[in-house]
A protein has these predicted regions:
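Composition-driven recognition of low-complexity segments enriched
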Residues: 1-269
Length: 269
């Protein structure tokens, strides 16, 4: 029999999704959000949800939204932040540093030293309880980032005004500061009034608050998550698309849900 060729006859695209693709997606989400793989019962439950129509955006969104309600989500995110910006400092190290500062306070009559180390303890206690405060909704993710850079551990890693300012831009904005930004940031760090990112400030706290309310910071959050989940930089269109609602809503977790519920993260077209 002869084969019959029909001109312009193109078969429809194959829209099926292999089971292994669904299972891999589920495990990727668990690892990214909870820091561990799904156990068999969890895998089966998620598979049943997604198997019926893995191309359904709403089904993937529901799956990811359930994951970010898990207590391990907050612990994993805190561990990621501490690993990225604080050399992986843990709760025991924080508690030990607080104890050292408390001992210094009880060993001196110098009022300046007492006030200095009392302030250091406050900053470390904010870091110590940040995870629970964030989980309880008492602070935003931006507050969490400010606490992360406002303690003696971060200061020791990024010692001095120049290193500190550069670290903010490189860690959270994915670029080096301009000469003007660097000089203004250094002035604020050293307690001298200056105009930084078009806003007036006079000290290190102002430096932090101005930076973490800037467009550069929110665009950097988008870049951070794209590199974490997609291993690539976002396009300029994607930066604008995702940073705008982030600036308006201040909802970091919502952005994570959008990215992990995407077809790109699942690995389908």
């Amino acid at each position: 029999d002869k084969e019959i060729w029909i001109k312009d006859n193109v078969p429809p695209p194959d829209l099926t999704v292999e089971d292994i693709v669904i299972e891999n997606y589920i495990q990727k989400c668990y690892i990214s959000l909870l820091g561990r793989k799904a156990v068999p019962d969890e895998l089966n439950e998620a598979f049943e949800l997604l198997r019926e129509n893995p191309r359904d955006d709403q089904a993937r969104k529901e799956f990811v939204e359930d994951l970010v309600l898990h207590p391990l989500y907050f612990k994993n995110e805190i561990n990621t932040i501490r690993g990225d910006y604080l050399n992986g400092v843990d709760s025991t190290e924080i508690a030990n540093q607080i104890a050292i500062f408390e001992f210094i306070i009880t060993s001196t009559n110098n009022e300046f030293e007492i006030e200095l180390f009392e302030n250091e303890i406050i900053r470390l206690e904010n870091l110590q309880f940040a995870a629970k405060s964030w989980e309880n909704g008492e602070i935003t993710t931006t507050d969490l980032h400010i606490i992360t850079v406002n303690n003696s551990f971060y200061d020791d890693i990024n010692m001095g005004s120049e290193n500190y300012v550069v670290s903010l831009f490189q860690n959270f904005a994915f670029r080096y500061p301009t000469v003007a930004e660097l000089n203004a940031g250094k002035s604020l760090f050293d307690g001298a009034p200056s105009v930084f990112l078009l806003q007036s400030g006079k000290n290190k706290n102002d430096l932090q608050n101005i930076f973490f309310s800037s467009t550069q910071y929110y665009e950097g959050v988008v870049s951070t998550l794209f590199q974490r989940y997609f291993y690539r930089n976002p396009t300029s269109f994607e930066v604008e698309l995702y940073s705008k609602p982030l600036i308006e809503e201040k909802n970091y977790t919502s952005l994570q849900v959008k990215l992990l519920a995407s077809k790109e993260y699942m690995g389908i077209k």
